[in-house]
Amino acid sequence: MHWLLSLVAKLPLGFLQGFGACIGELVFWLSPGYRRRTRDNLRHAGYNEAKFFTKVGRNAGRQSMESIWVWYRPTKAVLSRVKISPQAEHIIGSAMTSGRPIVFLTPHVGCFEILPVWLAGTHYEKTGRRITILYRPPRKEILRAVV
C-alpha cells in the first residue's frame, strides 16, 4: 500500500486535487448511506441549500488526495505550497517562542494535515517545541498503516 501511495504522491498536486474531486463525487453518488449522513449533518448544522450538499463529495475526495501528497512528499515540497499572512506568522511565532502551551484547533476544512508539517518545518528548529496531535485512528485497517 505504501508503495502505491508514494507513487500517487509523485503526481502534481493540481492533478491530484482534480482527480480527488472526480473520485470523491463518484463515491458520494454511489453511496446512499454517505449521502444520507451528509444531508442529515448539513441540515443539523443549518445548511439546507443544495449547493452545499453537492460539494461535499468533491471536497472530501480533494482532501484525501491532498493528504496523500502531504504525507508522502518531502517537507521542503510541502512547505513551498504554504501561504501564510505576515500577521498569522507573527501571532504563531510569538506563541511558539512564548514557552506557554498552545492548542491549535484545525477544522476539517482544506488540508488540515499541513499545519503540523509547517510548524515542524518552520518553528521546531528555532524553539524545540514538541507537537502532540490528537486524532481518531481510521476505522479501515488498511488506512491505519498509512496514518
Residue ranges and their predicted role:
Residues R100-V147:
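Catalytic core of membrane glycerolipid acyltransferases/transacylases, capturing the structured
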Residues M1-C111:
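Membrane-anchoring hydrophobic helices of lipid-metabolizing enzymes
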